A protein has these predicted regions:
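Noncatalytic alpha-helical scaffold of FAD-dependent oxidoreductases
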Residues: 1-472
Length: 472
């Protein structure tokens, strides 16, 4: 059993093992005020947006301001076997950036610069801490944009988007984060830095380690710089359709039919009856009086008007009560309804947000499975979906137990839901990642051999296992 000792670090008294205190002394000497052991700074690091909380303060926080800071931190942590949790803005929904006792949090939030924008090559070189929406605001005068758009884009970092391979409302047309990254600089657990990828559009030299790191949730290394692919801002009118259906199965069938017709809306979002009722209560509106399910479809680009007309024809033909608008303000107001979904649920209790994805043609079957699970367990599961790519977000609203734990009945229902998604040819996670919350189901999807291989790959990058232990 390790002996607990006292020490003073940056004028704050701390307790820890001999190696922990040695690490803190070394970090303080190397990084100065970039190191904090102040409980007020550490308290927010025990949670993210998933609703999970470790309820134990981490050892310390390093706020890195440069690649050198990251390298120094990891060298010291590696030498003294201190576990490190990389963290951006803490907006993750799977517990991937949550820290607990004895762990060192390495934040890249202060590394938030755009280092280069090349209009000719349609790329930008950025630091990981830049906020997604801020990046696009700064790119707009160049007529370019970074396409990945998670719902948290106003508060999430691009580094976090890369670490989780984030998706978003527009990814059915424009792709997920992996498709928008050309290259990375990644610091390994021992402090060495890898320069991965390239600036060219094409490149097939060696194994694609860039793609491997994207979505690895901080388990292979710490992303300290990214070369990202940009797109010209879409031109032409933006059309928005709001379509109400009598039930979620009909709306899901309409979204699948739009895809089957060869149409590629920029965004296609589906909100079920429970979602609409929660939003009604939160916003003081009466959406659910129009229909029990809302399907939002938005088209952009040169073919926007033709695509919108074709989508509208499909929707009306399948019984949708639909309106089409080219008014940008009205379109934004309609999608603000979708963005109000999670705040509406958070106003009702603690929320466990799930993230299954199925083939688009299986959306009606997955919604039917969720309805069956609701009835089986007697619990509501309000669900929204990125219908354009088959990614559903079933939500469980609950009252935590005395120690903050999720009630077992919620996990039982989630277990049935994951198995239903896998049976339909889907996945546990379309865009949020595995983190802490979905680890217990990882083997169900990957199988023993693939899971073992992934663990071996992780050990090659991080032989001591100090990076984000206990995660994906």
């Amino acid at each position: 059993m390790s002996t607990v000792n006292n020490s003073t670090v940056n004028d704050t008294t701390v307790q820890g093992t001999a190696s922990e205190l040695e690490a803190l002394d070394a970090l303080a000497a190397a990084l100065g005020d970039a190191l904090s052991v102040d409980p007020l700074d550490l308290a927010p690091l025990t949670a993210d947006k998933s609703g999970h909380d470790s309820r134990s303060l981490p050892l310390a926080l390093v706020t890195a301001r440069s690649i050198a800071d990251v390298q120094a931190t990891l060298r010291i942590a590696s030498e003294l076997r201190i576990p490190v949790v990389p963290r951006g803005a803490g907006t993750g929904l799977a517990g991937g950036a949550i820290a607990s006792a004895g762990q060192l949090v390495l934040s890249t939030l202060a590394m938030d610069r755009i280092l280069e924008v090349s209009v000719a090559d349609e790329l930008a070189v950025i630091e990981p801490g830049i906020i997604n929406a801020d990046l696009n605001a700064q790119l707009a005068p160049s007529g370019l944009w970074f396409a990945p758009d998670p719902a948290s884009k106003a508060i999430a970092t691009v580094g976090g988007n890369i670490a989780t391979n984030a998706g978003g409302l527009l990814c059915a047309k424009y792709g997920v984060t992996r498709e928008a990254v050309l290259g990375l600089k990644v610091v390994l657990a021992d402090g060495r830095m890898l320069e991965l990828g390239h600036r060219s559009v094409k490149g097939v030299t060696g194994l694609d380690l860039t793609a491997l790191v994207i979505g690895s949730e901080g388990t292979l290394g710490v992303i300290v710089e990214a070369t990202v692919k940009l797109r010209p801002l879409p031109t032409g009118a933006v059309a928005t359709i709001a379509a109400y259906f009598p039930d979620v199965t009909a709306a899901a069938a309409a979204s699948a039919a739009i895809t089957a017709a060869g149409l590629r809306p920029a965004a296609m979002e589906l909100l079920d009856a429970r979602s609409l009722r929660s939003i009604d209560r939160f916003l003081g509106v009466s959406l659910s009086e129009r229909g029990s399910t809302l399907l939002l479809v938005q088209t952009d680009g040169a073919a926007s008007e033709a695509e919108a007309a074709a989508a509208l024809e499909v929707i009306v033909g399948l019984g949708g009560d639909a309106e089409l608008t080219y008014d940008a303000v009205v379109g934004e107001e309609l999608f603000a309804i979708r963005r109000a979904f999670h705040p509406a649920l958070e106003a009702e209790g603690t929320v466990l947000i799930e993230d299954v994805a199925v083939p688009r043609s299986a959306l009606p079957a997955m919604f039917a499975a969720i309805t069956e699970i609701e009835e089986r367990y007697g619990i509501p599961i309000p669900t929204v979906a990125h219908a354009g790519d088959g990614n559903l977000h079933p939500n469980f609203v609950y009252t935590p137990g005395p120690d903050g734990e999720v009630p077992e009945i919620i996990w039982q229902a989630a277990d049935d839901m994951f198995r239903a998604a896998l049976a339909l040819g889907g996945t546990l996670s379309g865009e949020h990642g595995i983190g802490i919350l979905k680890r217990r189901w990882l083997a169900d999807e990957l199988g023993a051999d693939q899971l073992a291989l992934q663990q071996q790959i992780r050990a090659v990058f991080d032989p001591l296992g100090i990076l984000n232990p206990g995660k994906a």
